[in-house]
From Swiss-Prot:
Homododecamer. It catalyses: 3-dehydroquinate = 3-dehydroshikimate + H2O. It comes from Dinoroseobacter shibae (strain DSM 16493 / NCIMB 14021 / DFL 12). The keyword Lipid metabolism does not apply. This is 3-dehydroquinate dehydratase. It holds the Pfam family DHquinase_II.
Amino acid sequence: MHITILNGPNLNLLGTRQPEVYGATTLADIEHMCQRKAQALGLEIEFNQTNHEGVLIDQIHAARSESDGLIINAGAYTHTSVALMDAVASVSLPTVEVHLSNIHARESFRHTSFLSPVALGLICGFGATGYVMALDGIWAHLTAADSARP
């Protein structure tokens, strides 16, 4: 099974950007954590980051033919992008939305997620561990779906 993990704007600055909110873990650290977890679960992952909404949409579209599931931390686009919501809905892949911080405990504009209505699940507030939790969750969903097939 193949999982695409997408990261949106400013996540390339993790480790130095507002460590009091996002922690000291870098995106490279998170990728390494995901690689270890994926290997333990027998998954292959593709890990990407971009600051550009259109590139995220292109990567979501590409996942349609390359992946069995999607994990996405869309950063601030979570709260603003109908286009990302439409892209996720259009590919019909099980999708887990991840956020390092608890978006519901922050500014009110962060309480709205355009992705949640089209996602299988949402994990927020657990820092970098949320990505590992997302891999566990999507693996459990996919293997349960496989075992339910005749």
